């Protein structure tokens, strides 16, 4: 997963120290925490139907400027989409 994060532009990937989050990436000098603790993700359950459902739901999350959140590297949604799902 570390190699995947670096290929997406992250400098570092660590376990999150923020309550309720799984991971954190260092991207452009800012830490971005993502992934809810206590919930499974595709890396743990490998269920293609659940992955498709997650992606369908999260495609609908838009930023104020109308861009999908999962396409913007400064959002937790981007990192969860690419590293966990």
Question: What are the residue ranges of the model-derived segments?
Answer:
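Arg/Lys-rich, low-complexity, intrinsically disordered basic segments
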Residues: 1-85
């Amino acid at each position: 997963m570390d190699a995947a994060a670096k290929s997406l532009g992250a400098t570092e990937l660590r376990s999150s120290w923020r309550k309720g989050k799984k991971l954190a990436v260092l991207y452009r000098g800012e830490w971005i925490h993502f992934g809810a603790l206590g919930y499974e993700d595709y890396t743990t359950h490998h269920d293609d139907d659940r992955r498709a459902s997650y992606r369908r739901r999260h495609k609908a999350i838009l930023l104020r400027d109308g861009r999908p959140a999962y396409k913007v590297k400064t959002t937790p949604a981007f990192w969860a989409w690419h590293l966990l799902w």
